[in-house]
Structures are given as structure tokens and as C-alpha cells.
Amino acid sequence: MSVRADQRSESSLLSEYYRKYGASGYVLTIDFSKYFDNIEHESLFQMLSEQIKDKTLLALTKYYVQEFGPVGLGLGSQVSQILAVFFPNKIDHFIKEKLRMRFYGRYMDDSYILCNSKEELQNALKEISKLCEKYKIRLNPKKTRITPIKHGVDFLHCRYKFGRTGKIIKSGGRESVKRERRKLKKFRKKLDEGELDRKQIAELYSSWRGFMQYFDSKTLLKKTDKLYNKLFIEE
């Protein structure tokens, strides 16, 4: 699930931006630090109580979350992923409705805003930082930054750039494969230590494979599938 002004793809959003402003302007890239580990339960429960009116469902959800301890959500579970997408929902509305930023996208802990004014993005970052502090969401200072849009937009391990005619050029599949191969080896260790089970790992890997379908990456996927099978299937 990705959050945008009207749920379009990044490529179409950048194309619209280019038609309006060309390749000038800036991108504010926002990254939450150790997002799953730091989700604050009290804030999450307050948001859930505003949305879930069924008391039984709300109680079950709270019980599930509390199983992870006083703070954070576990990796692998689909419920955790849904809650992780939901948690910054108020920030999404603030950016789109209060700051009136049209060119905005988010998935989990990665988000970006495109704007032709650097000053507007600087002011937006100040306001977003205050809201994150309120909900105890930590911004990653190294990855949260404002850069010229002509250098590209980094989102979900991809880089989107404008071609000479405004065509959107998408790259980054090879780097994503390298990261995923490292993750699979860590997942194997977590499996051995009982922190993850095979079903959770399969769901995480399936989600990543779905994302990789956007790339011309059949050969890379075959190699990664081979590693996955070696670590989790062929035993």
C-alpha cells in the first residue's frame, strides 16, 4: 500500500510534475529511523481507537501489538505491515491537506515531497519534524534531506530521473537484489534463533519479489530465488 495524492504510480506523479515545472525544483526525502522497532504503542492505540469502533476488534488488535513488548512491531506479520502503513496516517493528511503538497508519496517509512520551492520544503520539514516528535517517530537525519530534483528521486530502493525529453528513467534493481540477498542470510539466522518462522519469511520474500516485477530483472531474480531455495527449501 502506497500513499499518494490520488494513488498513482511514482512515474505518473513525476511526469505530471515535469509537465508543470520541468526538471527544476527540489525533492524532500523523508526516512523514519528503525521504524518497526520504534513504533510507540500508546500513540498507535490512540489512532486505532479513533478508527476502530468495534470494541472486540480493537481489543484483539491491542493484544496482538502488546505481544511485541512495550514498543515496536514484529517483522513478517501482515498485521504488523498494515499497522506500519497506517501509523503515519495523520502525517499523510497533514502534508496533503494542511501543507497542501500535491506531489507526495509514502510507503511504510519511506516518503518524498516534490516542490518547485526549496523554502517551502524547508518549512514543510520543520512542521513534519514537530508532528513526528509528537507521535514519537524518529527521523533519520542522514536520509532525510532536500536535494535538487534533477539529481533524481530515491524511493523504495529505486531512483527516478528525468530524461532529456521528460521521460521517467527508473533504475536501482541490482542494488535492491544485493540488499535482499543480505536480508535472506539474516532471515536464516533469525529462523534458526526462533525470531521468524518460514511463513513470515516467505511473505516477506514474496512481497519483495512483487516489487521487483517493475524491473527488467529476470536473471537477477533467478539468482536470488536460487539463494532463497538453498536457505529455506533445500534442507
Stretch-by-stretch model annotation:
Residues 5-108, 112-129, 137-141, 147, ...:
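Conserved polymerase palm-domain catalytic core
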